[in-house]
Every structure is written in structure tokens, then in C-alpha cells.
Amino acid sequence: MKYLTLLTVLSTALATPLQHQHHHHHEHARRAEVTKVVYVNGNGDEVQSQVTENASSGASSGETAETIQTRSSSDVSSSSDSNPVASIASSVASSASSILSNIEGDLSAFSSPSKKFEDGVYDCDSVPVGQGVIGVDWISGLNGGWTTIMNENGDTSLNCKDGYYCSYACQAGMSKTQWPSEQPSNGMSIGGLYCKNGKLYRSNTDNDYLCEWGSKDVNFVSEISEDVAICRTDYPGSENMNIPTLLSAGGKAPCSVVDGDTYFKWQGGKTSTQYYVNNAGVSVEDGCIWGTEGSGVGNWAPVVLGSGTTGGKTYLSLIPNPNNKDKPNYNIKIVGDDVNGDCKYENGQYNGSGSDGCTVTVNSGSAKFVFY
């Protein structure tokens, strides 16, 4: 089940998030692939083989186990002195480094984009990376680095093409600015750039840039020894949790906090940011996807976070995921300079005993989600 947290101002100091469930979503699940890796010597003779099954994004959707086997064999046999294990390890490390550099984006934290987007210039084939826009290239069933490709009828496509809205990801701390003011009446949402005659156009011409910063005062902070994949839902859009933030072990990353008074409205109601948080050690390409039942990743991740501002105050939430009651392999708490309320998820319990989640109001200063 996917749901969006709506932050509302209550008469009490503590806000309680409201939830709704859309009637439409499109699932992009990574398909399992069987890969046979064959090691050969300088004469081309097989010396060792290994078969693995995984949900891999390393191969394109058109690539089969046979072609992966052939590629691995030729790569390893190219030098009689090569170490096949080291070669594969190097390839994996290179791939991970490429993904990391891609999702980090090109802007330093809270540095404004400087180049206005030009309508009718960029081809629809791929997302126009830069100025805060990042490509998401591990989603099975989507090409070009897009996060959702959908038209007004709810039809989806592998490729961004004429008549479709092509949604995109922004780097951590930023939010997309593009969605049409006229939304479908059936409750689904659409967002992104519009493809017309093979070129990309803004669907919201009130904003010259594709990404914008939210509040500067909320961060994710890690006090643990493994990375955490924090996955924002693509909204307005499919609501699939494929917008990545990587919280490095012992590091910090900005949290996207949208202003509910000015950001996208769903049927007139204010909306906020929602994240699905995977167990520590799960990579963004494995965790920032639409997961499968029991997988523990994506929409089955153990923790959901909410953030947003309205009326000059910021609201931060820890929300139970009804898909997954298992406790994560970390604890998490919200702390700040001036907050009303107490909110933590420790040893599988909210605030020590509850199971209904919790919300705090940030009156002033900074706040953070601390993983410990």
C-alpha cells in the first residue's frame, strides 16, 4: 500500500499526519535474472563457473544470461595474467562509484541553480541531467533515467514520448518543480516535463528551474557504520519510492522539506515529502524501487518518514509501514533546537511503547533525523 502524508495544523502543538491512498499506481519492479559467470584461462578453457540469481540492474532489460556469460568470459580471457575475482570486484566497485556520483548531483548544498531550463531544446530520450536534476537508471521498465512516464489517462511507457509527462529526480534536499496545474479527476497525479514533437517542455512555466531547495534546517545524520538508502516517493507521479538519498555511514545528507502552502496540492489539500527507509546496508539501486512482498525494500522497507512545512512551522514524522512490521537494523530519533513533542523509533517501538508513529513540531532552528 502506498500513501501520502498530509500535514495539517492542529490546535495542539503536535501535528498528526493525515493519510490517503491513491487509486492508481504503476509498479516498476526489478526482474530477477540468472547469471552464469564463467572463468577461463588464457587458452579459453573453462576453469570455474558460478551461477547466481539476483535482481540486477547491471544488465539492460534486453540482455540475457547467455550474453552476460559471454561478456564475462571474453573480459576475463583477454589477459592470461588477469585475476578474474579482482576484475569482477573492480567492476562492481566502479559501478557503485558511478551510481554514487550520479545521484549526488552537481550543486553544492543549498546552492541555487543558475541555468534556466529551455523549452523545446532537449530531446525526450533522456532526462536533462544537471542544475540539480539527476538520472535514475536502475529502474526496470523505464529508460532514459526517468522516474515516472505517464499520460493523463494513467497509461505508462518505457520511453518518454509525445503526449506523456516524464518525471525526474532531484538531488538530496531538492524537489522537482514541474507538474501540470490541471490534474486527472480520478485521484491519480501526474508530474514532470511534457514531451511534444520529440522535445521536452515545462509543464509548470511559473518556474524556470527544474529543481528547487526546501528548508535548509533539516538533515539526516548517521551515527552507524553502514550506508542507508532513503527513498522518496515520486509525487506528483507514480508515487514509487525511487528518488534516492544516500546517507553515508557516519555522514549527513539534507532532507527535502517542501512548503505545503506553496507546493503541489492534491485536490486542494497540502502535501508533504515522504520517504521509505531501507535497512542499513541496502544500496540505493536495490532499495529505491517498488519492492515485492516480503523483500524488505522499497515500499516494504521498515521505516517511513514524513517532512513538510506549513504556516511557518516544520513537521517531521516517523510513520509505521503497514507492509512491514519488522524492526530495522538501526534506531532513529528526531532531535532539534526547539521542538514540541518527542519522537523516536527504538528497538521496534515508537517512543518506547507505541506502534502508531509520532510527529514533532519544529518551532525554530534546525532539526535532524538521527540514525543510531
UniProtKB/Swiss-Prot annotation:
It comes from Candida albicans (strain SC5314 / ATCC MYA-2876) (Yeast). The gene is SIM1. It is found in: Secreted, Cell wall. This is Secreted beta-glucosidase SIM1. Residues 1-15 form the signal peptide. Residues 52-85 have a biased composition (Low complexity). Residues 51-85 are annotated as: Disordered. Its EC number is 3.2.1.-. The keyword Secreted applies. GO terms for cellular component: cell surface; extracellular region; fungal-type cell wall; mitochondrial inner membrane. GO terms for molecular function: hydrolase activity, acting on glycosyl bonds. Cell surface beta-glucosidase involved in cell wall maintenance and cytokinesis. Plays a role redundant to SUN41. Belongs to the SUN family. Keywords: Carbohydrate metabolism, Cell wall, Cell wall biogenesis/degradation, Glycoprotein, Glycosidase, Hydrolase, Polysaccharide degradation, Secreted, Signal. Disulfide bonds: none annotated. One of its GO terms (biological process) is fungal-type cell wall organization. Induction: Expression is up-regulated during biofilm formation and down-regulated by RIM101, CYR1, RAS1, as well as by host macrophages. Glycans are attached at N54, N351.
